[in-house]
């Protein structure tokens, strides 16, 4: 019964934090676009972009660590494998949220932005490639949302799972008499 409670708590927490992480990553897309719209380019824009990326990167690591520690404190009988599974669930759910948003952004929200960027790329590349290759690249635009979803989902999930593995090793359960290496 206690393991079912831990599993239920784990999914509830993962859903909440998955939405938060996915929201942070989705908002970061628009911060980059806002910088372009405000013409924050050049050295200052690059530095600001790096600072924002660093803040997002470190902030997400700290937030993941906080979520895992809080779960450990709220569920004293949770072992390290439970804490890792929480992180894994957060990673997969946030990857799902972010990937879905990225596809919606490409297909519905910022269609003109992506169309203009893709047209610019095709125009520049067409100067060096044969016409047949250029036509094949134009046909890839139809599949861009699919590739974006799959690529983002795999990358974000793997990154989050590795991060969860690393962080869960440093978050012991509250009960020193529980064998933390045991899989339940």
Where are these regions (language model features)?
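Alpha-helical transmembrane spans of integral membrane proteins, capturing the lipid-embedded, hydrophobic core
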Residues: 14, 18-26, 53-58, 87, ...
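Transmembrane alpha-helical segments in integral membrane proteins
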Residues: 63, 145-176
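Short, charged juxtamembrane terminal tails flanking transmembrane helices
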Residues: 1-6, 171-184
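Functional transmembrane-helix hotspots
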Residues: 100-127
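Membrane-helix interface/capping segments
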Residues: 63-82
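Short amphipathic alpha-helical coupling elements at transmembrane boundaries
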Residues: 79-86, 123
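Transmembrane alpha-helical insertion/packing segments
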Residues: 1-67
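Short membrane-interface loop/juxtamembrane segments of multi-pass integral membrane proteins
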Residues: 123-145
